Amino acid sequence: VSHSTDDIFDEFGYRRLSEKYGVGLIDLNNTDFESVGNPEFLRFDNIYYPSVLKDAFLVSLPVLKGDDEFEMAGALSNMIGAFPARHYKGFFSTGKNKIRKWNLKYSVHDINLCKMPDFALIDASEHGYILAGQPLEMDKQGARLLGFDWKEIGYLKLLDDTLSEERDKDKSVGELIER
């Protein structure tokens, strides 16, 4: 079921909070975007990504839960919302059907390579916790709270592998090599 962002802003009280505290709301489906390419993408050639997020300090605020499509809903899977619907909806639907051409773990991986959230604040209160910190690490902790091995969560394993390879490349730059 697809809902308009305006309906969601109203239904969950975001518009009321926005007005009360003078904080703006942005519908990422209707904002300017740029085409982003990355050789590390696993399925997309390029992604239309909201320009407003590129240089912003991005905080992901999910509720931790198991999920049929993602295995686990966390800070990184929450970024699926950054895919603008006008580019990823099907011809006869308002949902983002084009991100479901393949397993969603690939869409989560690729959108997070455009820009990973800078911080995660995960409501895991159902399990007695609030998780706060680096998004990948917080999602790993969330998986543990849900009784999963994080390496069995497709998008977490893919992102960890990609980011580990990048860290390994960074470590090799400037190392003294003995003969």
Which residues make up each language-model segment?
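Extended, low-polarity segments enriched in aliphatic/aromatic residues
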Residues: 2-179
